[in-house]
Amino acid sequence: MKELILTLQKEIIVPVEMDKVLPEVIENMSLEEIKNIELVQGRKRIKVADIFDVELNDIEGEPRIVIKNSSPKLKYIGSKMTKGEIVVEGDAGMYVGAEMKGGKIVVNGNAESWAGQNMKGGELLIKGNAGDYVGSAYRGDWRGMSGGTIIVEGNAGNEIGEFMSKGLIHIKGNVGIMAGIHQNGGIIIIDGDVDVRVGGEMKAGAIVVYGKVEEILPSFKFEGIVENPVIKLSKKDAGTPIAGTFYKFSGDYVYNKPKGQLYISVDSNPDLI
């Protein structure tokens, strides 16, 4: 298989869309063919070799792309990818991993907003911070993340998991407002603190918060205190065990018969109830 190493030659101002450079695309291409792949930059089209130094190696296993000296101006990295691996050495722009179906993306830096948007499968690992709308839907759409795993080792912004229906989002830092808004399934785990309106208008799925919460919406029902719960999202679900002692809430009761589950750490929120 092929390993493609792209080294950004200099700082770019106008964003470049990287959705044409995918592991499954380059695995059967020659070096010259890769250099001539067209990318959209603003109102014009450029070639890969116009902004990158390009190196192609033979490796064992799945096809792999490494982007060195990366920039937040590089958008749509790994968009719709189905296999292989992409490693981003630096920051990634908006829509990294959007609609990805398989494979793995590792961002050794921060990611801009809409990381993993409408993600369907695969794994997205962000070792820095992420912007707003992690694992969310497109503007005006009601279909968010439907599979796969997103892990953010830093903080994330607002409205993570919007309209999420399946999969896992794990934020190891803090998050902003409206985490899990309109959530329809899947699990969101937040190790840090959460701002207001967590789980707003969720119908199903689960949100676990180990840090502090600013509030619980009045449309959620307190179900009691649970220890080391096993989260089951359906009758056939084997369950996901969660360590700790939690306040359990159900909701959001702005809907009829909601199945959403909130688990809020007792240790971090001793005065919540």
From Swiss-Prot:
Start-end of each Sequence repeat: 78-90, 97-109, 116-128, 142-154, 161-173, 180-192, 199-211
Pathway recorded for this protein: One-carbon metabolism; methanogenesis from CO(2); 5,10-methenyl-5,6,7,8-tetrahydromethanopterin from CO(2): step 1/3
Membrane-spanning parts: none
UniProt GO BP: methanogenesis, from carbon dioxide
Region of interest called 7 X 13 AA repeats of [GW]-X-X-[MQ]-X-X-G-X-[IL]-X-[IV]-X-G, as start-end residue ranges on this chain: 78-211
InterPro entries in the record: FMH_DH_FwdC, Formylmethanofuran_DH_suC, Glu_synth_asu_C, Glu_synth_asu_C_sf
Matches recorded under Pfam families: GXGXG
Assigned keywords, A-Z: Methanogenesis, Oxidoreductase, Repeat
Catalytic reactions of this protein: N-formylmethanofuran + 2 oxidized [2Fe-2S]-[ferredoxin] + H2O = methanofuran + 2 reduced [2Fe-2S]-[ferredoxin] + CO2 + H(+)
Enzyme's top EC category: oxidoreductase
Top-level division of the source organism's lineage: Archaea
EC id: 1.2.7.12
Molecular function as annotated in GO: formylmethanofuran dehydrogenase activity; transition metal ion binding
SUPFAM superfamilies documented for this protein: Alpha subunit of glutamate synthase, C-terminal domain (SSF69336)
Family, as annotated: Belongs to the FwdC/FmdC family.
Function of the molecule: Catalyzes the reversible oxidation of CO(2) and methanofuran (MFR) to N-formylmethanofuran (CHO-MFR). This enzyme is oxygen-labile.
Summary of subunit composition and partner proteins: This enzyme is composed of six subunits FwdA, FwdC, FwdD, FwdE, FwdF and FwdG.
Listed name of the protein: Tungsten-containing formylmethanofuran dehydrogenase 2 subunit C
Organism whose genome encodes this protein: Methanocaldococcus jannaschii (strain ATCC 43067 / DSM 2661 / JAL-1 / JCM 10045 / NBRC 100440)
Gene name tied to this protein: fwdC
